[in-house]
């Protein structure tokens, strides 16, 4: 993750490409993803992460007008690239959890 003025470059570990997003949006999503994964010990799917973000935003009374799914995958990929999240396949399903 590279930070420039009010932007963060998010790295996709699959392609090696970077995409810049607003740093406040990055913080919002990374905190939500971290909080969701902190509660899960076994690992959860991407769909469960997105649903958890929506619930987190609702609980916190956060209104977000952009695509939650797009930002969720972008920030999640950056967190994987920075070794905050680990992913693995189990019975044909990709699971995610915080790296120990």
Which ranges hold each PLM region?
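Short, cationic-aromatic polyanion-contact patches
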Residues: 90-100
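Short, positively charged loop/turn segments that connect secondary-structure elements
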Residues: 54-72
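Short helix-capping/hinge SLiMs at alpha-helix to coil transitions
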Residues: 38-42, 56-59
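Alpha-helical DNA-recognition elements
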Residues: 74, 78
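A short acidic, leucine-rich amphipathic alpha-helix
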Residues: 48-53
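Long, low-complexity, charged/polar intrinsically disordered regions in eukaryotic proteins
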Residues: 1-35
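A short, conserved structural fragment
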Residues: 80-90
């Amino acid at each position: 993750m590279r930070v420039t003025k009010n932007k963060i470059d998010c790295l996709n570990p699959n392609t090696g490409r970077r995409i810049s997003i607003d740093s406040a949006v990055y913080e919002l999503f990374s905190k939500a993803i971290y909080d969701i994964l902190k509660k899960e010990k076994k690992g959860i799917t991407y769909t469960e992460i997105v649903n958890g973000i929506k619930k987190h935003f609702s609980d916190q009374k956060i209104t977000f007008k952009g695509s939650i799914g797009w930002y969720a995958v972008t920030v999640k990929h950056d967190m994987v690239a920075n070794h905050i999240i680990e992913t693995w396949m189990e019975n044909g399903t990709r699971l995610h959890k915080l790296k120990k």
